[in-house]
Design a protein with these regions (language model features):
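Transmembrane alpha-helices of multi-pass small-molecule transport proteins
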Residues: 21-68, 153-157, 176-191
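Helix-helix packing/entry segments at the starts of transmembrane helices
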Residues: 85-91, 164-180, 215-247
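Juxtamembrane helix-entry segments on the extracytoplasmic side of multipass membrane proteins
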Residues: 22, 30, 52-55, 128-152, ...
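Loop-to-transmembrane-helix transition segments
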Residues: 1-4, 43-72, 141-150, 195-213
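Juxtamembrane helix-loop boundary signature in multi-pass membrane transporters
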Residues: 1-2, 97-148, 152, 166, ...
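Cytoplasmic-side transmembrane-helix entry/capping segments in multi-pass membrane proteins
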Residues: 1-3, 54-65, 108-121, 140-144, ...
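C-terminal transmembrane-helix exit sites in multi-pass transporters
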Residues: 44, 75, 93-117, 192, ...
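Hydrophobic/small/kink-forming positions within alpha-helical transmembrane segments
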Residues: 6-10, 41, 63, 67-71, ...
Length: 287
């Protein structure tokens, strides 16, 4: 699980690096998706399952939502301090809880509702210094909204994965994500694609490879340990993101960011410990 958290943190850091090198977000997503499609097809062939699955409408919806959410997440990675952008992603349990209650009739516990309140307080503490000026920075506000939108999209994707988990192989669920991303990025952004230099290609390939390493490590961890423990350890990604932001992007988290992060982490970890074990496969498929 430590390897998974480190791999996903490295992936996000490379996204930020690639964006800083002038590589368009659509191109970053395209390369990531091409690598994911190739590796997913290998896994599906070994599993001897049909690559298109059974509930193709829901699978396509899961891929589409994931694509939109990924655009928002990558924009936040590039524009916000890396640790802060990563922290916003861990607000997705709030949205997942609300969506699961509405669409799946899963009633949240009092502990979960308390965690949501604590996480919202943490979000308020984290962003308050940026909003107290007469004219908050528009780029920051847009990136903040993108980060929140990415968390919402992740919540929707989690809910769809939960709906699909009873009938679809995890590799098929994962496959639909990059299957949507490849044509969508070509249609929407191919004219902006550039030919990167060596550093750019290294960053792009690293994004794809670290994504797969993170997924494989996460899946393996969830096969041998409990959902609460593995999910809790996944929050180490935030710590790794803070370290990478400090080492490579000269980003030092403010006291407000640290205080807000502490509250969000508290809410997320307690919520994870209260979740049933069947979320193992859901979490792995979502990543």
């Amino acid at each position: 699980m430590l390897l998974s958290a480190l791999a996903f943190a490295a992936m996000g850091g490379l996204v930020k690096l690639a964006g800083g090198l002038g590589i368009p977000i659509m191109q970053i997503i395209f390369v990531r998706a091409v690598i994911s499609v190739a590796l997913c097809l290998v896994a599906i062939r070994r599993a001897h399952v049909h690559p298109l699955g059974q509930r193709r409408g829901l699978l396509l919806a899961r891929g589409t939502v994931g694509f939109v959410a990924l655009i928002a997440v990558f924009y936040a990675f590039i524009q916000l301090p890396y640790a802060q952008a990563t922290m916003l992603q861990y607000l997705h349990p709030l949205f997942t809880t609300a969506l699961a209650f509405y669409f799946l009739a899963e009633r949240p516990t009092l502990a979960t509702l308390g965690c949501i309140v604590v996480s919202l307080l943490g979000l308020g503490v984290m962003v308050s210094p940026y909003l107290q000026t007469d004219m908050p920075d528009r780029t920051y506000l847009l990136a903040l909204l993108a980060g929140l939108g990415g968390a919402l999209g992740s919540g929707v994707a989690y809910t769809l994965v939960r709906k699909l988990a009873s009938s679809e192989h995890p590799s098929v669920i994962v496959l639909y994500f990059p299957m949507v991303c490849v044509p969508a990025t070509l249609i929407l952004g191919v004219r902006e694609f550039i030919w990167p230099d060596l550093a750019g290609w290294t960053a792009l390939l690293g994004v794809g490879l670290f994504t797969q390493l993170g997924q494989l490590s996460l899946t393996r961890a969830m096969q041998v340990d409990s959902a609460s423990r593995t999910t809790s350890l996944s929050y180490l990604q935030i710590v790794f993101a803070a370290v990478l932001g400090w080492l490579f992007f000269n980003e030092i988290p403010s006291s407000a960011t640290l205080a807000g992060a502490g509250l969000i982490l508290l809410g997320a970890v307690v919520s994870a410990w209260n979740q049933p074990s069947r979320q193992n496969s859901d979490h792995a498929a979502q990543k």
